[in-house]
Curated annotation (Swiss-Prot):
GO molecular function annotation: homoserine dehydrogenase activity; metal ion binding; NAD+ binding; NADP binding
Record-linked NCBIfam families: PRK06349.1 (NF004976)
PROSITE patterns: ACT, HOMOSER_DHGENASE
Protein name: Homoserine dehydrogenase
Sequence positions that bind L-homoserine: E191, D202
Required co-factors: a metal cation
Organism whose genome encodes this protein: Lactococcus lactis subsp. cremoris (Streptococcus cremoris)
């Protein structure tokens, strides 16, 4: 027998599926005792069809989703179009038509995941999306299965390959933000509009999905604090290294007694931290749990073959669940009420880069300002000034989010001081 699937969108990942099906044909046959067949492919227009055929692909290419929905032989629809629309509409229609769905669309899932999962359960079909987070790392299924008997207290990830590539260039080769972005765009890692990558939006979408699997809580995009790379200067990167850290864009979730706190931000990681050596476009997820302890999952965050492999794994899982009669079960079965942490309960050390007048007594004034909010210094570095302005760099002891906000407000209100940058610092 054959399992017939349809693909919506035949770009980088979509064109990688046929190769994987061919390379793993024998293994898949032994696992499933069935063959997975690409029955139809939805294309954008006739020009796209001609291009695909010129590349040697001879599938039943269609321009109308109804051709797929009306085909009773097709049991799985694989959405690889990206963006929220028309993907949301197409997935909704596929679910309502009784089709199981696989998608790699993190943007869609972060914004409309609750609605789509509810619809899938209503129609007793599967909605799987392993490839939506850290494409080549099977992190979602690992969280759903291997950590089902464990309590996760902390998750830290490098979740965006583009920003990690840029930070690697800035850290290892001394490039500026603009230079590293230009190279990322030249290599095709970053879009012409890099907003989602450099402002932490892409990573926040992935973090929202990870929250559901690791903590059982659904986060709206606005529940996640976000800051990106645009303000980072070469001096920030150099000072991080001087103090024994590496600067990375991370996504982090902490659970405390009052709830969870999620944030995407540039972070000073100790050079000894497992994620400090994750470079280039690679992704990694670091997990602290009460049972297992510390775990690290590392792999490609994107790319044709890694992402297509995760997509195919979802297809295989659906076929197996259909055979054993458990297809109606949710991809993630761990859910509880969402509780956001009290900002008084979230503590970290912080790096502050502050521009001051280059005159006697300014450091003392800065100390007094921080002391007024009960913030003490772990490390201080006063850089050589130009006679008019100087820069003071501070790493604080641990402070909570309320203290952090108060310090930032006071610095911004002081006419003689200018807060250049503020980054989270991990480590004891």
């Amino acid at each position: 027998m054959a399992v017939n699937i349809a693909i919506l969108g035949f770009g980088t990942v979509g064109t990688g599926l046929p190769t994987l099906l061919s390379e793993n044909k024998e293994k898949l046959a032994k696992i499933l005792d069935e063959e997975i067949v690409i029955s139809k492919v939805l294309m954008r227009d006739n020009k796209a069809i001609e291009k695909a055929r010129s590349q040697g692909f001879n599938y039943d290419f269609v321009l109308n989703l109804d051709d797929i929905l009306a085909d009773s032989e097709i049991s799985i629809v694989v959405e690889l179009m990206g963006r929220i629309e028309p993907a949301k509409t197409y997935i909704t229609q596929a679910i309502e038509a009784g089709k199981n769905v696989v998608t790699a669309n993190k943007d869609l899932l972060a914004v409309h995941g609750v609605e789509l999962r509810s619809l899938a359960q209503k129609h007793h079909v599967a909605l799987y999306y392993e490839a939506a987070v850290a494409g080549g790392i099977p992190i979602l299924r690992t969280l759903a299965n291997s950590f089902s008997s464990d309590k996760i207290t902390h998750l830290l990830g490098i979740l965006n390959g583009t920003s990690n590539f840029m930070m690697t260039k800035m850290s290892e080769e001394g490039w500026t933000y603009d230079e590293s972005l230009a190279k990322a765009q030249e290599l095709g890692y970053a879009e012409s509009d890099p907003t989602n990558d450099v402002d932490g939006i892409d990573a926040s979408y992935k973090l929202a999905i990870l929250s559901e699997f690791a903590f059982g809580m659904t986060l709206a995009p606005d529940d996640i604090a976000k800051s990106g790379l645009r303000s980072i200067q070469k001096t920030d990167v150099e000072i991080a290294q001087q103090f024994g850290y590496v600067l990375k864009l991370t996504g982090e979730i902490n659970e405390v007694d009052s709830g969870i706190f999620a944030e995407v931000s540039p972070t000073f990681l100790p050079k000894s931290h497992p994620l400090a050596s994750v470079n280039g476009v690679m992704n990694a997820v670091f997990i602290e749990s009460e049972g297992i302890g510390d775990s690290v999952f590392y792999g490609a965050g994107a790319g044709q073959k890694p992402t297509a492999t995760s997509v195919l794994a979802d297809i295989v899982r659906i076929v197996k669940r259909v055979k054993d009669g458990t297809i109606g079960k949710s991809f993630n079965e761990y859910a509880r009420s969402t509780s956001l942490a009290n900002p008084h309960d979230i503590e970290n050390k912080y790096y502050f880069s502050v521009e001051t007048p280059d005159s006697t007594g300014q450091l003392l004034l800065l100390v007094e300002l921080f002391t007024s909010e009960n913030v003490s210094f772990e490390q201080v570095l006063q850089q050589k000034g130009n006679g008019k302005r100087a820069v003071v760099v501070i790493i604080s002891h641990k402070i909570n989010r309320v203290q952090l906000s108060a310090i930032q407000d006071k610095l911004n209100q002081e006419k003689d001081f200018k807060l250049l940058n503020r980054f989270k610092v991990l480590g004891d």
